[in-house]
């Protein structure tokens, strides 16, 4: 896992009706009287504002009812057209919800006072404690999140945490987490499961999947810069090649560009010994793709559908982020390494092409 990620949860699960559905949300905010605090939910990428209250004496209170918990945000805005500022994220559920600092040691504002919000706050505190040890933090937090998903596989906490973090886990972990959920949730995460199952097919030890010119529907064909067909199979079967690295990249991708010096060093040193690179670009337009190839001196093989993320190779190799790469042994047709970064490419070639 390469990143430390903060929890952002969302949701939905059923509770009883009647008086138990009443909720209050209270908090303090250093702001002038009359400033509005908004309660909003998220639908896709859009915010849906469902209520607002005015600050009075540096405090605000929302009151309402709900028959099912849902994920929401408290926001402020400096004007109608201004970008909203986050006050807190919370679960709206029956009970008295308080927005406050947990303590002086953990000054970040959290929602507490009801079961789901208390669970989220507890997980947040555990994460902060783990982050004190920077060396072990990333793996420990990943483990904490995954264990929390499994422990809450039957409720909103686990489902939301999975949505926020699934791309950090190994394919089998994703499959196992979904399998632990109720049937209805498994159906909602069907595409995640299918992607994880596909990712299992391109782990080291598996045969490569050919990359061809075929587009899907109206999807553009995957072609070379001069508009020709260059299948990955033809590169593997070229007797001059012993090892081929499939490199998924794009000219607009900063991390991809930072890998270029390392790829060039490995290519210049080992190309004549049988090392080839087959670059698959996720560029949207031809001009920046071709410009990057020319200006950066990327003198290896290149193909692209010039269609951003919508290309068959991306799905076949279960690529969720770039840069991504897969090293194939031409003699066996099998993938022998993945996600080589920095000097790892050159070191791997030194090991293989002594």
Positions of PLM-derived features:
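Bacterial Sec-dependent N-terminal signal peptides
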Residues: 1-28, 354
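A non-transmembrane, solvent-exposed segment enriched in polar/low-complexity residues
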Residues: 17-148
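N-terminal targeting signals for export/organelle localization
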Residues: 97-102, 138-219
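A short beta-strand-turn-helix
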Residues: 221-244, 269
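Loop/turn elements at helix/coil->beta-strand transitions in domains of secreted/extracellular proteins
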Residues: 239-244, 272-275, 297-300, 331
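Conserved redox-active cysteine motifs that mediate thiol-disulfide chemistry
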Residues: 248-265, 282
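Thiol-based oxidoreductase modules, predominantly thioredoxin-like and allied folds used
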Residues: 273-288, 298-309
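Thiol/disulfide oxidoreductase modules built on the thioredoxin-like
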Residues: 296-298, 305-354
